[in-house]
Each structure stands twice: as C-alpha cells, then as structure tokens.
Swiss-Prot record:
It comes from the Eukaryota. It catalyses: L-homoserine + NADP(+) = L-aspartate 4-semialdehyde + NADPH + H(+); L-homoserine + NAD(+) = L-aspartate 4-semialdehyde + NADH + H(+); L-aspartate + ATP = 4-phospho-L-aspartate + ADP. This is Bifunctional aspartokinase/homoserine dehydrogenase 1, chloroplastic. Residues 1-82 form a transit peptide. The gene is AKHSDH1. The lineage of its organism: Eukaryota, Viridiplantae, Streptophyta, Embryophyta, Tracheophyta.
Amino acid sequence: MPVVSLAKVVTSPAVAGDLAVRVPFIYGKRLVSNRVSFGKLRRRSCIGQCVRSELQSPRVLGSVTDLALDNSVENGHLPKGDSWAVHKFGGTCVGNSERIKDVAAVVVKDDSERKLVVVSAMSKVTDMMYDLIHRAESRDDSYLSALSGVLEKHRATAVDLLDGDELSSFLARLNDDINNLKAMLRAIYIAGHATESFSDFVVGHGELWSAQMLAAVVRKSGLDCTWMDARDVLVVIPTSSNQVDPDFVESEKRLEKWFTQNSAKIIIATGFIASTPQNIPTTLKRDGSDFSAAIMSALFRSHQLTIWTDVDGVYSADPRKVSEAVVLKTLSYQEAWEMSYFGANVLHPRTIIPVMKYDIPIVIRNIFNLSAPGTMICRQIDDEDGFKLDAPVKGFATIDNLALVNVEGTGMAGVPGTASAIFSAVKEVGANVIMISQASSEHSVCFAVPEKEVKAVSEALNSRFRQALAGGRLSQIEIIPNCSILAAVGQKMASTPGVSATFFNALAKANINIRAIAQGCSEFNITVVVKREDCIRALRAVHSRFYLSRTTLAVGIIGPGLIGGTLLDQIRDQAAVLKEEFKIDLRVIGITGSSKMLMSESGIDLSRWRELMKEEGEKADMEKFTQYVKGNHFIPNSVMVDCTADADIASCYYDWLLRGIHVVTPNKKANSGPLDQYLKIRDLQRKSYTHYFYEATVGAGLPIISTLRGLLETGDKILRIEGIFSGTLSYLFNNFVGTRSFSEVVAEAKQAGFTEPDPRDDLSGTDVARKVTILARESGLKLDLEGLPVQNLVPKPLQACASAEEFMEKLPQFDEELSKQREEAEAAGEVLRYVGVVDAVEKKGTVELKRYKKDHPFAQLSGADNIIAFTTKRYKEQPLIVRGPGAGAQVTAGGIFSDILRLAFYLGAPS
C-alpha cells in the first residue's frame, strides 16, 4: 500500500479508505508520526510526491496530549470550585480587533480569582473553513485564494492587536498553520473527498487563532494568562446521531495533567474542538462552543458560566416576531431546556446538561450592552425576582416548516406494537419526530416531522402498513403540510390551575384553529400545532394573554371625516394611558377615505395623520386595505372601525367577520338593512370568536345597546322601548317654544351644526326609524325598515327640492301646521316630541310626533339630549331611563372608542 508523508492528524490510524497516509510532524522539539487515511483516494504513482511537496513547515494537526512542551511551567494541582468563573464569547463577540479588545476588557474587569474563557472563531471564519473544504472537494482551485483571505483576515487583526514578540510569534504560528492547511486542502483536492476527521481538523483552526490572539491581548494588561488547545483536554465520544458525548473521567485526567504544566490565573480555551478517546481531532458540531464552555465549567466546578452574545438575554418570545417581548431575569434549567428544544434562541439543550449536575448557574449577557443584567438560568428559586414573579408561563417558542402525519384506523385500538411499528418505520428513513399526540381511544396517532422529511415518512408508512390499509384496519395515513408548532413553557404551570384554559382561550379569541395538542405530565410545556400562516398571530395572541406584553390591536379606520377624525385624535391622546395602565396598545395601521388611504405596519403617527394622509396616501382600495389590516401577522387581533354611513361598507361586515376581523361601527346600515343580512351577521357572530360591536349606532356614546342586552341576558322581558333618539330633533323641539317658528329653529340648528348639511335627512325621520329597527331586532322582533310607519316632518311639496338652500328658503311657508300643533299641545299642558317606539307586545314599531305632559321625563329634556325608556317585566311600573347627549362628534367618537376598548378587554386586557 503506498504511503504518503503529511503532517500528523491522529495518534492512531483511522481506517476510512484504501490508502493509508503516514503523517510526520514537528511540535515544539519532538517529532512523532502516525497514520490517517483518505477515503477513496485515487491511486497515482506520483501521489506521494505531490502531497509531500506541499509541506513547507510541518505543524501539529491533531490532539497532542502526549507531547512535550517547549516551555516548562511550575507544577501545580488544579484548584476546582468557586474561585473559577467561566466566560464564553461567541464569534460575533470576537468578530474584529475592536471587539476582541472589548472582550479582553471584560475578562480583565472580572474580579474572580481565576478565570477560564472559552472563545469561538472570529465571526464567519468557521463558515469560511467549511467553504475551503467544499472548494477543495470540488477540485475548485479557488480554495487557494480563499485560504489567502483567511490568512489576511487574521494577519490584519493580529497587526491591529499585537506588537513586538507577541505579534512575531503569532504570525509565525499563523503562517505555519496556513501552510499545513494548504497541504491538507491539496490532499483533499487530489482525493476529491475529505473524511470527517480531516474536515474537523480544518474547521477547528479558527478557534486556535482567536484564542491565541485574545490571550496575547490579555497579557498586554500585565496579567498571568495562557491559552489552551481544548483538544489536549476535552475528550468526547461520537454517537450514532452525529453528536458527541463528553467523557468526563478521561477529560478530568487530561485537565489535571495539562494544568500541572500550564497553571495560570487566566486561561483562554478554544471552543468547538475536542478529541476522541483515540486522540482523533473532532468538533462538538454546531453550537459546540456553548457546549465546550458548559463542559469546562463542570470540569472546573466554576461558580458561574457567563455566555456572552449579541442580545440582552433570553426573551419571552422571539423579539423579531413579538416586538413587545421582554428579557426574562431568570429561567430554570428545565425551562431553558424546553425553550431551546422548541426553537428559542437560548442555548442548545445539551449545553445545559453538564452544568445542571453541579448546580452551576448560566448567565446570558450582551457584550454590546454591559449595563443589561441578562438572564440567569439556574435551579428554580421559590422567591425568584423574575419578570412577573407569579407568571406560570415564562415564554413561548415556535418551530416552523413542519408537517403533521396522522395515522388513523379502528384497527389500531388494543393492538400491541402499532406505535412501535409506526415509529420504527420513521426511524428507518432517518426522520426526526418533533412532537407526538395520541388519542386515548388509540384510534389515531399523529406526530410532527420536518417538512423536508415528510415525503420519505409517508412512503415508509404506506409501505409498512400496505396490508393494514388494504384490509381496512387503518383508514388513512394523512399528511397535513405547512404547519408550525407553538409551545408555552413554564415550570409553574404544573402548580397553577387554568393555564391551559387561558392558553387555548387566547388562541380561540385570535381565531386560530388548532391541529394537534401535546402536553407531558410534567406540565413544563403545552404544545400545539397550527397552520404556518397563523403561527405568528397565534404567538402574539398567547404572549399578550399571559401579560408578557400588551394586548395589541391592529386598527383600520374607515372614514376619517368628522367622527373618524375625532376618534383618531381621541386614540392619540389616550394611547399612553392605555399602554401604561391597561396594557392595551391600539395600533392604527390603516386609515382610508373614499379616495385615499394610508397604511403603516408599525402604526401610523397619529400626531400628524392628516398631514401624512395628504403626503403619503395612496389610491383607496378596500380589498387591499382589508388584506393589509388582516394580514399583519405581528399583531394577532385586527379590527375594522367603520365611521361612515355607507351601505356598501356595511355590506363588507360579514366578509370581515368571516375572515377573523372584528368590527366596531356607528354605521346603522348593516343592522337596519335587509333582515336576512342582519340575521346572517348575528349568526356568524354567535358561532365564532369574532366580535361585532355597534353601541354607537343608537345612542352615540349612551349605553343603549349594552343596557338592552343586559336586561335580556339576565332574563328580563322587554315590553316597550320608547325614546327620543335624534339629537337634532331633540334640539328642534326643545327649542320650538313660545312664538318661535319651526323654520327659525331649523335654521338656528343648521347654523350651529346640529343638523346634517341637508336638514331633510334629519326631518325625514329615517335616522330614527333605523334606530327603532335596530332596537326591535335586538329585542327579538323581525322588523323591516320598509314596513315601519314613519312620520316625515318634511312637507310633501318640499321633499323634491333640488337643494338644501331651496328647502330652507321655502320652509317658512309651512310653519303654520306645526305651530298649530304646538299651540294645541300647550293648551293641554303638553309638549311635542319626535319619538320612536318599539312595542314588543304588539310586535311593531312606529316613528312619530307625539304629545307628552310637561312633567313627563321626555318633556324635561334640554339641548340635544337623547332619552330612552325601557318598560320591561321588572321595570313595568317605573321604566328604566337612559338619558344624555346623543349627538356630536366627541360623544359619538367616544362611544366608538368605548367599543374598541370593550373588544380589547374581551381579548384579554386586564380590566
């Protein structure tokens, strides 16, 4: 068998191919050699010469625990325990020379007696090293220029950080390493293949270089500092699942040996890399540096492990998906483990295992924000001072790009081994099961797998259960694609009743359909599967419900006229109070009129919405507007607020409710329009968790609808509803006294802004008729607006006037009739009032001008007040009366605002 000389990779041969490679190398002053092998290396007569020629300056390529060192050190026993603090800095933290200086400053500032610092490669370097391997395997000559880029990156960083002997020494080692890498990559280039050992060796160099540079920078501060090649100490055993398990016994022995030769108060250790028991270089795979730090922390029995990142700590949810996510002050080991498993950017679950054994707390800190205290992960503390001390749920996490596999059939019940057969088939294709849910009836089993693996899983199951499917024992193997998992995590869930109810209630109110549910008996998490498109909205909904953020509503305002504009101003003025005291965030993300609309995902600046509407508004498009308000996945709940009197807009309500958009409106057209449309909307409202509020349709800001509902819901029976429902007509007849003519009072009201631009819209009685129709329907009567008797106060000859001006000009000609009715009423000690009546006993309604005694509540009104009297079974002798302003922009907008807040409370805001 041909033998090729290279540099040492292992201290025993690794049999991976048909060509053994003998690799001599020089480390310090000692020459050793060993055997490694290339897989499927093409035999060539010149292979030895080709590879040997690449070796300019042989250097160490593997673990060297058995080698002598150049510099003798004072022998000493390794002191373990609380005197040690362990820090881990990721690639972003050591991404350039300035950041390495910042890291050194943190290390120097730590007043712990002894410090071990674990570092990753500089940012992107590990990816660059993998890219070198890929290029060499592909026989792409550009690996040489890419390697030069790696050299230059580290050379430039070293020049910026070091000087004198430290710089010369590091650059010499760097150049030697680059030459050896060049030889290794040349061998990979020739073979067209890199074994795992060769790959691990190549990619581990980034950590070697960053550790040496950081150690040199710390020494510039005059401190006793050395660096550790973790391959000399850390021993791991590869597993069948492409992971590694630490060998603590062997690692302890090697650490003791290493420390007797390298005792120092500060040790800078390489993360990510280690050795096998056979001294073959390996890595701890992705996220391995955190794992390295945890293992080292356990080996040194440190008092704390601090993992430095570029975030302030562990968040209650992904802040990219939930903008109001908060940094948690504490997490238990189990909570961190669960959140990591379900995709939270905390730690890899295996990182927690080594430190749990010795109760070593982990602190997640931000290297770019040293003032932030971070998150401590430790054993659960009964009196923990965390965010929301008694919060049963600490946080939420999601996993996307999953598919749900449902195996269903009556033949599964009571048959031993069915579940085993299912998951054996899944294992055979190498698929990873994320979540399992089984019905207690044993009729079905469903589980979630990554979407990229579901095709293989489906084929394996159909093959395994072909006979059972043909025989009817299994009814189907169903694949549900485009799914996501949402998990709620909290150790206190187990001792807190009602957590599940709150969780599922929040999802229901956000109109989220759940595909599958799983919860272990430990109750550390509740897991649900939802549609991928609903995932962010579901996350926001549950996050809000557990008080970890505000209850947030995406608000779309339709009709920014007098009422809508006043509402926007009220929301602007009250926004801060709502957020601070009630945890409600009303985010107006859209405003549309008949010609222009304005939209902003983060929320429109209400201090200048009028200006923005003019400058940035685009052409109005109701369908586009609707999709925008509904499609904002960052806000789980959306509401359309219709401030118009447009029948076309009202016809959209059913579709909005069907799409999960709540509706708030003062527009009377939907509830007083065609009866079938009204019944359809109310039926949908009752069957879904989508809300429809319309208090302002009858009494502006007065609680008319809510009072009526309260009476009915408590078992009272409506006999009669009678009232003055129009603020305009109330004002007219309250001031139609003495010798004043009716036309004079109408002109005065129009001038004061109490009437519509065309007063005939008020005098026709249609507005009152709509309110009577609404109240009749709320009372259970099936009345139609068209069949309601309405007394029109517009004289017939004037109903066809071409303009409001013409009408006002001719109105005095008809004053005599109403003046006569007033005189007759006064003679009888009565007054005229324009009222609407719902007669629930006779099942009819009327709108007419009636006379009331002067001591009647209706006769004692002033201004533009409304008054409504409810005569019921309970309030038969003395009606229940609601009285107050029933018109005006401020009170109407206030009524709409009240409905919006009522919706927020329904959705989980604290009351």
